[in-house]
Design a protein with these regions (language model features):
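Conserved N-terminal ligand/cofactor-binding loop architecture of enzyme catalytic domains
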Residues: 2-145
Length: 145
């Protein structure tokens, strides 16, 4: 059980997140992006990488499921007609952009769920986006933006 988790969503939030570090507390820093991970490693700051909480089989399942959804949603009969313009399905134009976005969101959600389950923190300090997801996953943990 960890007293406090400091979640770093991206590099631009890293400096703010590090302000919450206190040597006397049992804290764990977990970053969700590779740039923050590299920077923390360069600074010699102990941390974990969020994706390390997901097993490779789960990563593959997340990737395949996201791909299956994102490359077929616009062909759904219920919405297909709303997306047709001059015989072109506009949903097709969005598939690559949406795939990357949803893949990141789903990976972050699964990572966060596993992190909270494994670490059992008393408190989570995070940025806005991860904070909202954390609140949905763990109603018992004190969460601070």
């Amino acid at each position: 059980m960890t007293d406090e988790l400091i979640l770093v969503y991206n590099y631009k939030n890293l400096k703010k997140a590090l302000e919450y570090r206190k040597e006397e507390l049992d804290q764990k820093i977990i970053c969700f992006d590779f740039i923050s991970h590299k920077h923390l490693r360069k600074l010699g700051i102990s941390h974990n990488f969020a994706e390390d909480y997901i097993e490779s089989k789960e990563k593959e399942l997340i990737d395949n499921t996201t791909r299956e959804i994102m490359f077929s949603w616009y062909d759904n009969d219920d919405i297909k007609n709303c997306l047709i313009y001059k015989n072109l399905n506009l949903g097709w134009l969005l598939e690559n952009e949406l795939y990357g976005y949803f893949l990141e969101v789903i990976k972050n959600f699964i990572s966060l769920k596993k992190i909270i389950k494994d670490e059992k923190p008393k408190k989570i300090v995070s940025t806005d986006s991860l904070c909202a997801i954390s609140k949905e996953i763990s109603k018992k943990t004190q969460i601070e933006i």
